[in-house]
Amino acid sequence: MLRNQVLVYCSEGVSPYYLRHTIRFLKYYSTQEGAFDILRVDGNFLIKNPFWEETTRLLVFPGGADRPYHRVLHGLGTARIFQYVSEGGNFLGICAGAYFGSKMIYFYEPEGAPLQGARDLGFFPGTAKGPAYRGNFSYVSPSGVRVSPQLFSDFGLGYAMFNGGCFFEGSEGYPGVNIESRYDDLPGKPASIVSRIVSKGLAVLSGPHIEYLPHYCRMVKENVQKTREFLQRERTTLDRYCQNLVQRLRQPAFSKADC
């Protein structure tokens, strides 16, 4: 059966703001090769619909809060997602979706003790730790939004929007993990975007908000305005990376000739 759908998770924990950017991002970078059907789905769909794996090329988890993702999908939901990728599907997790796609998370809460715990998917087999830039993150305001210099492995220095995302701790020590980008201005330049072939499928996890399209942003908070204006000027490298990324995610990780 032809896999011609992109499913975007839209349930408890997903930020409506980042969901809109994610949908626009997928449409924007898919126009050159013909649009896929982009569907918003909830946890009930992923758990109970018996056929979604057969028609889905890419499953996307946008930004928001990871804990509700885990609470809703833990068990049967995550088992089906992992099996879907193993059998040739592709997965993209951005910010909260990247935490959700890792084996362990460690998150410095704005108040109180850090959140730490295991997650089911383990596409990154280590700890997603964040926020990578500490000090300003908030669940209720965009105070943590900032520009993040990114050193892309194949495209050089670029910039992306950041708000609460992770870095992938010790990523160099895990066989099969490909570091696609690093935080260029943080000590040790930790991995910010990683990918991994999982049997026949591809999983990509991104700490920064690579889906953010500044020309759609209407927020008036000063730090958001500065971020938007900067990224409107300095977008060439990120644009090249995103074009390449979406092209890869729209294709099978392995062709029939590779099998």
Swiss-Prot record:
Coiled coil: none annotated. SUPFAM superfamilies: Class I glutamine amidotransferase-like. Belongs to the chlamydial CPn_0128/CT_035/TC_0305 family. This is Uncharacterized protein CPn_0128/CP_0643/CPj0128/CpB0130. It comes from Chlamydia pneumoniae (Chlamydophila pneumoniae).
